[in-house]
Amino acid sequence: MGMVVKRVLSFWGKGGVGKTTISSAFAVALAERGYSVYLLSSDFMPSLHDVLELPLTYEPVKVMDNLVVEQLFEDKIIDLWKKRFGDEVYRVASSIFPVGPEIIDYVAGAPGIVEEFTLYYIYELFRNLTCDIIVWDTVATGGGLRMLKIEKEFYEHLGEAVKLYLKVKGVLDKIRTGSEEPLKLIDSWRLLAQDVLSFLKNASHFATLVSRPFPIDFQVAVRAYQELSQFVPIRFLFINMVSFSGEEKEYLKKFEETFEGKLDIFRVPRFDPSPRGINALRKLISEKDLEKIESIVF
């Protein structure tokens, strides 16, 4: 296969709709088509190992030719944040207040740190990984939206943080002491947050909404589409677990009326039991649907 531009295919939706199963099925299918695939789950209630029937591990694992899988965990994210930003946070905080290195652990436990760093981690994977596509299984919709909103608020907050720093330290004091590093660090965080937001809206990112043909699922999908569209380019809608019962037909029609012309819509039939393991996942996505998405993404 020739060189391709790296892509991100992300899956969003409420809990229980089958994001992990569908994202895993896509990862397997693309790997078997010769693409180098990195399957990542940022859902801290992990089910990726159950779907793939693999041992739970903190490190990326190669599960078949062309496919590497990684499950993120909250404590791992906190440790990575400390290694990447802990020293910088200490240098900024200690330049203003009389604090010791213990401030790093305090900030690491602050609300929003895990969500913000998770996005940074995925951004860094996109920049540095050698692969054709990252398939990203996100946290359930509420947590996913919170994660995106925190990143936006973090970016906006850092602009104010620079002003606050100048007020606290004093411009004259900064000039006298030459203490410019904290300002540079704060500004570098702001620019990095901007880069992460830009990455999420990048043309190489293809977001997928996953739902089911049920009343509550439909309502959540409509709200999720409206809110997620502010942050990520949603291209596809997968209606999962379709059995074409009477009520389902009504909501399949509502999905089509609501999203036709906005998203490419795909239906995935119900499987009992739910697919588990690579062999079962091979049967989940139709060849026709796979070819259509492949032609759009690549």
Feature map (PLM): residue ranges:
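C-terminal lobe/tail of nucleotide-utilizing enzymes
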Residues: 196-298
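Switch/connector loops and helix/strand junctions flanking conserved nucleotide-binding motifs
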Residues: 47-50, 77-81, 142-146, 245-247, ...
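A conditional alpha-helix N-cap/helix-loop micro-motif detector
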Residues: 19-20, 115, 186-190, 218, ...
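Extreme N-terminal starter segment of soluble prokaryotic enzymes
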Residues: 4-8
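Walker A/P-loop NTP-binding active-site region of P-loop NTPases
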Residues: 9-72, 129, 134, 138-152
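P-loop NTPase motor core
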Residues: 49-106
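Short, well-ordered alpha-helices that flank and scaffold nucleotide-derived cofactor binding pockets
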Residues: 28, 32, 124, 226
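Phosphate/Mg2+-binding loops and adjacent switch elements
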Residues: 95-208
